Amino acid sequence: MTWTVAPEPPDSPVAKALWRAYYTEVSDRYYLLHRGHRTDPSELARELSRPPTTELSFPKGQLLVARYEGEPAGSAGIRLLADNTAELTRVYVHPKMRGKGGGKLLVLSAEAKARTLNATRIILDTRHDLTEARALYTALGYEETPPHNDDIYAEHWFTKPLA
């Protein structure tokens, strides 16, 4: 079984479907943990109706889509910030595809894309309950750092030099 990773326009049907799956999962996990219920359908509809970000389009960044046996199974975004720093964002692998190496491949592909944008380091933030993501980042050499933003949902911040 094989994985492939390739750039994808953020406004494509594939990207939109993966964004819906990503947002639904991380939002539901947050609300179930902190409020005891899933995301309110109106909030979900409002968030998903926003136009795709241009920050994940060249030359500012890139959205990458992972396909398993040709079927879309995950995504990751990379966006260039100031001072040769790139941010890794929206890393997602469909639950049925987890444990097959797709997350690692997406992150490594995003790092490679960041290098082509002349980034010398990569940063990210994540939540405490996203334990799978934190384990992946640590296994790939990311180090936890003090906060680099004030995102209300961020609870852990990581960085990695891009050699």
Question: Can you describe what each PLM-predicted range is?
Answer:
Residues 3, 120-163:
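C-terminal "cap" of GNAT-fold acetyltransferases
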Residues 3-85, 89, 94, 107-108, ...:
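Acetyl-CoA-dependent GNAT
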Residues 13, 100, 131:
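Loop/helix-junction capping segments adjacent to catalytic residues or to phosphate/diphosphate-binding pockets
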Residues 53, 97, 120-121:
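Short, contiguous strand/loop micro-motifs
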Residues 68, 94-100, 128:
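Active-site acidic-Proline motif in GNAT/NAT acetyltransferases
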Residues 70, 101, 118:
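Conserved G/P- and acidic residue-centered "switch" motifs that form tight phosphate/ATP-binding loops
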Residues 93, 99-112, 135-139:
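Conserved acetyl-CoA-binding loop-helix of GNAT-fold acetyltransferases
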Residues 107, 114-125:
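Conserved GNAT acetyl-CoA-binding A-motif
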